[in-house]
UniProtKB/Swiss-Prot annotation:
Any single biological process term in GO: positive regulation of transcription elongation by RNA polymerase II
Annotated gene: ASF1
Family of this protein: Belongs to the ASF1 family.
Name the record gives this protein: Histone chaperone ASF1
Originating species: Cryptococcus neoformans var. neoformans serotype D (strain JEC21 / ATCC MYA-565)
A Gene Ontology cellular-component term: cytosol
Length: 208
């Protein structure tokens, strides 16, 4: 049984320019107080072919965690251009993935992935993208309404565990009432291919 369940994730500035920070507001419920802090990370998937290019944009610790509904704001900078695998327009424009992860006692218990579309707003640039990326004219749109949620078993503070399959929450477990249903029923549009994100875990990635 998960002691912590995400109720809602908002991206306060969406869509935005590519180089703008990501400003999230995360609401979660703890069914019991926690001894340690929760650790959160935001990861930008730079390449579908290698986790080498994943960028951890920022991380934070949140605590102490009382029982009940909790919320916090989490801001992270945009990905660094020089750490991207390529700055060719064909590689920058289009769809990639960002991932929010949450861990307790250094063990990840949930990750939420989102598609991110990178594009030019200017019609002329859309039709004829310049050979050199114009970063100041790039925009992004996170498909915040279409999350992909993966949960992992965690021992928490010696809490009793339900039976699980492959380390994930049992399918019969229902989300807390009043939460965002998209966080518990989170389809991604096909087709997809598999890409490995930070930490060696899989995340869905759209095909080119």
């Amino acid at each position: 049984m998960s002691i912590v369940n995400i109720r809602n994730i908002e991206l306060l500035n969406n869509p935005a320019k590519f180089d703008d920070p990501y400003n999230f507001r995360i609401k979660f419920e703890a069914i019991a107080p926690l001894v340690e802090d929760l650790d959160w990370r935001l990861i930008y998937v730079g390449s579908a072919s290698s986790e080498e290019f994943d960028q951890e944009l920022d991380n934070c610790s949140v605590g102490p965690i009382p029982a009940g509904i909790n919320a916090f704001d989490f801001s992270a900078p945009a990905p660094a251009h020089h750490l991207l695998p390529s700055v060719e327009p064909d590689e920058i424009l289009g769809v990639t993935v960002i991932i929010i992860t949450a861990s307790y006692r250094e063990k990840e218990f949930v990750r939420v992935g989102y598609y991110v579309n990178t594009y030019y707003e200017d019609e002329e640039l859309k039709e004829n993208p310049p050979s050199v990326v114009q970063w100041d004219k790039l925009h992004r749109n996170v498909l915040i309404e279409k999350p992909k949620v993966t949960r992992f078993q965690n021992n928490w503070d010696s809490a009793p565990q339900l039976n699980t399959f492959d380390g994930q929450q049992p399918a019969a477990e229902l989300p807390p009432s009043g939460g965002n249903p998209e966080l518990f029923n989170a389809p991604l549009p096909p087709p997809v291919q598999r890409a490995t994100a930070a930490g060696g875990m899989d995340v869905d990635q759209p095909m080119a």
